[in-house]
Amino acid sequence: MSKRKQVTIPIEKIQEQDKYIEQIHRQNEEYFNRTGKRKLVFTQTFGCQMNEHDSEKLCSMLEEMGYQMSMMVEESDLIIYNTCAVRENAELKVYGNLGQLKHLKGKNPDMKIAVCGCMMQQPHVVEELRKKYKHVDLIFGTHNLYKFPQLLTESINSDKMLVDVWDVDGEVIEGLRSNRKFELKAFVNIMYGCNNFCTYCIVPYTRGRERSRTPEDIINEIKELVANGTKEITLLGQNVDSYGKTLENPVSFSELLRKVNDIEGIERVRFMTSHPKDISDEVIYAIRDCDKVCEFLHLPIQCGSSSLLKKMNRHYTKEYYLEIIEKAKKEVPGIAFSTDLMIGFPGETEEDLLDTLDVVEKVRYDSAFTFIYSKRQGTPAAKMENQIPEDIKHDRFNRVLEAVNRISAEINDGYKDRIVEVLVEGRSKNNENKFAGRTRQNKLVNFEGGNDDLIGKLVMVKITEPRTFSLNGILVNN
């Protein structure tokens, strides 16, 4: 594959969007002065942290336009779905939600409906929306997020469906700036796209090829976040271990981790996602050496069968994966692992499933995102023979899930009476009288004691009650 030239949108082009933001803001203010009501927007995000971060940018633009966030579809003037194409279930939810909106649109013709994200990068999806969901007003993809104010302005002034989806070889944006709402924890993109072409995956077709941001841009963004109160950074990429290869002056991911670790004011650094074929010893050493980088590694295996991994085009074996795990355990005491487990890939046998269960037992994951394989149009796996019947998929899924949950509970049981460091994120969602936060190993902890002054601080908590998916405890006097 020839090396692709990275294209960065000039800042002047991004700033051109300000006039559209101001135009909509002016219209929304006039509406408020006339009615006493604010324009409301409902957003829903499907999929990965990349999509979540894109939605943060959209919400920042919407706030600048004068919209207020709403939790109710029925009362909203603008509805936005940021979609995911990785699994069929997420797509079906989007289609179902859009179908339900047809009735609301009939009652309120001024309502605007926008759909964006990875689903929209697939031509057959756009064609489906054109034919069957004509009440949708605006469709745009993953590469032209910065143009949203302009697209929304055009849509508001038109009764026709507006479609603006760029091909992956078109102009792409690196480093979109927005007046985002800074929180305690923040995602920071370090790269975009993927070059791996796993046979089941649609991401290279929807997110494009790998492009890395410069270390300078990444570090400047993090410093800005820290200045506004952010304590924990998660570095994002489809495959962070490939970071830097497309830069004019290549920088490795391990080097970037060390640079980020040196930024003053950061308490914790996390990253995802790593690829087993690309993670280097240097990355493991960086986790070991860098005091702010958390002892936690999300390392998707997908399945434990080397023969299936070859069919998936993953470029590693079960044995190689386990070697990485052992090296990480040796170099980073107390490290926790999470993974992705795909059940029911075409041709999967009982022996293949036993290999997956064997990996689960040997690694002992703290958590695992376990899911059933679903066909993705345009991927090689969708055309493979020996597709697994749904009943067998579900039976195998339940067996793997039982093992994952049992091991997670066993690991958590080992936390009884231990004192752990917790970054306090706020009040517990389940009990307003308690506080919640996470350990360096990404364990959710709900604890008693303290007050709101603790939010954003590192505290010590004694674990009194381990649970399957969380830990309960009490604040230790610091």
Curated annotation (Swiss-Prot):
EC number(s) given by UniProt: 2.8.4.3
GO terms, molecular function: 4 iron, 4 sulfur cluster binding; metal ion binding; N6-isopentenyladenosine methylthiotransferase activity
Domain TRAM span(s) in chain numbering: 410-477
Keyword tRNA-binding among record annotations: no
Domain MTTase N-terminal span(s) in chain numbering: 39-157
Binding site for [4Fe-4S] cluster 1: 48, 84, 118
Cellular location(s): Cytoplasm
Enzyme class, spelled out: transferase
Cofactors (names): [4Fe-4S] cluster
Domain Radical SAM core, residue spans: 180-410
Binding of [4Fe-4S] cluster 2, residues: 194, 198, 201
Catalysed transformations (reactions): N(6)-dimethylallyladenosine(37) in tRNA + (sulfur carrier)-SH + AH2 + 2 S-adenosyl-L-methionine = 2-methylsulfanyl-N(6)-dimethylallyladenosine(37) in tRNA + (sulfur carrier)-H + 5'-deoxyadenosine + L-methionine + A + S-adenosyl-L-homocysteine + 2 H(+)
One cellular-component annotation, GO: cytosol
Chief site of localization: cytoplasm
Subunit structure, interactors included: Monomer.
Known role: Catalyzes the methylthiolation of N6-(dimethylallyl)adenosine (i(6)A), leading to the formation of 2-methylthio-N6-(dimethylallyl)adenosine (ms(2)i(6)A) at position 37 in tRNAs that read codons beginning with uridine.
Family named by the database record: Belongs to the methylthiotransferase family. MiaB subfamily.
Protein name: tRNA-2-methylthio-N(6)-dimethylallyladenosine synthase
Gene: miaB
